[in-house]
Amino acid sequence: MTKPFSVVLASLLAITSTVSPLASAQQSQPLDRIAAIVDEDVVLQSELDRAVRNVKSQYAGRENQLPPDDVLQRQVLERLVLVKLQVSRADGNGIRVSDEELNRAIASIAQQNGTTVDGLRQKLAADGMGYADFRASVRDEIIVQRLRQSFAQSRISVSEGEVDTALAQQAATGSQYHLAHILIGLPEGANAEQIATGQKKVDGVKALIDKGELDFSAAAVRYSDSPNALEGGDLGWRSLDEIPNAFAQLIRDMQPGQVAGPLRGPSGFQLLKLVEMRDANAGGEKKMVTEYHARHILVRIGDNQTEAQAKAKIDTIRARIVGGADFQATAKESSEDTNSRGQGGDLGWFPADAFGPDFGKQVESLTDGAVSEPFRTQAGWHIVQRVGSRQTDVSAENQRAQVRETIGRRKLEEEYNRYLQELRGEAYVSYRTGDRADDNATAAPAKSPDPAAPSPPPAKPTR
């Protein structure tokens, strides 16, 4: 399912852009300096300061759930480093965002926030952020999204057998689970000392939670190495097919509010919290859609055929059919759609939006047996003949599609997190924040303080 652009961009823009009431509080800034060197790129101190302010603005009224400023700064800086690394890798893979695409994206963001692009610019200026910086943030987010999509297309697959198994599990349990997690990361091929350090740290975090000194979300913000740490480790609602098999059986036996772990996973040690449960089948009902059976003839536009030539050709073809020529025979002879020409242009049964909105509108407007006027799509010039229509229950089909998507999303999350660890491990990263504990650290992500012997937080956080 495609999310609204404002939602898709939210995670990164929360870090890299402002639109924050705190931003305007800093009216004057010292001369900018480098906060981190990331291979051949840099993170500027102004970027880091802006990102930290935005995280704090999201926790307004819940400040006691945030870690100390030095820890928060490290977490945010590490996330900015990962963004830089992904953008660099995307550039190496030829992933680009044109100015036109960027303009459309920003216009969409403005519209979904109830304003115009000019209004958005004014809001950004009032909050202390330059429009050029905002454009760069949006461009980076689109690039990261495309890198992730490219990764999914090349490395993630879901078999029909996996879908069948997941559907059987869903039928057996009928439940969905709202989960949160804390990850104490381990590098790939971790040695015994690194594993022991990770085990000590995760045991310390679990002890803090068990004693009530930190609630789970606050502990996630403070200690988790997961990309969603600053969201309290919230994983949202998951069905069992979205949960790694090693954890699925544990979750079945848990009650809301319980915390399981430490558990060893591919990326390190994890603590898993079951926040709440719900019936996945509640409100289930048939979903009926109109499907159409149609044939079409396509004349393409290209180097060997101009727009005018293609239009003249499709007009001639339609005139022949209206004059009595058989549509299927004419399609076999004249259509330039190689996928359907051999079947006389037959497209089978399909929902109206299957071939794009323009094609769908033409099919919907026809009566059975009628032939459309020539119309243009990105593919070229068409005529279409509607053969029939029917009402179809697509509940089972939709359910399979949803399950396939959730399995793919879970696989992508696991694999992409490992991919990010690889990127980070291969990179030259040097922090220049002025903190001796962090500066000049290279090729290994910054970690939060070891909680094995933690000092108590300033105040007990609330949920």
From Swiss-Prot:
Its Enzyme Commission number(s) read 5.2.1.8
Q: Could you tell me where this protein is found in the cell?
A: Periplasm
Regions of compositional bias (Pro residues) in chain numbering: 451-463
Chain segments carrying region Disordered: 329-348, 431-463
Comment text on domains: The PPIase activity resides only in the second parvulin domain. The N-terminal region and the C-terminal tail are necessary and sufficient for the chaperone activity of SurA. The PPIase activity is dispensable for SurA to function as a chaperone. The N-terminal region and the C-terminal tail are also required for porin recognition.
Biased region (Low complexity) positions are 441-450
Signal sequence, renumbered to the chain: 1-25
- For the protein in the UniProt heading, the enzyme class is isomerase
**What Gene3D superfamilies does the entry give?**
3.10.50.40, Porin chaperone SurA, peptide-binding domain
The name of this protein is Chaperone SurA
What would you give as a GO molecular function for this chain, any one?
Answer: peptidyl-prolyl cis-trans isomerase activity
Keyword field contains Cell division: no
One GO cellular component term of this record is: outer membrane-bounded periplasmic space
Q: Which species is the source of this protein?
A: Xanthomonas axonopodis pv. citri (strain 306)
Top-level taxonomic group = Bacteria
Q: Which reaction does it catalyse?
A: [protein]-peptidylproline (omega=180) = [protein]-peptidylproline (omega=0)
Q: What are the PpiC domain coordinates in residue numbering?
A: 174-276, 289-388
- What's this chain's function? Chaperone involved in the correct folding and assembly of outer membrane proteins. Recognizes specific patterns of aromatic residues and the orientation of their side chains, which are found more frequently in integral outer membrane proteins. May act in both early periplasmic and late outer membrane-associated steps of protein maturation.
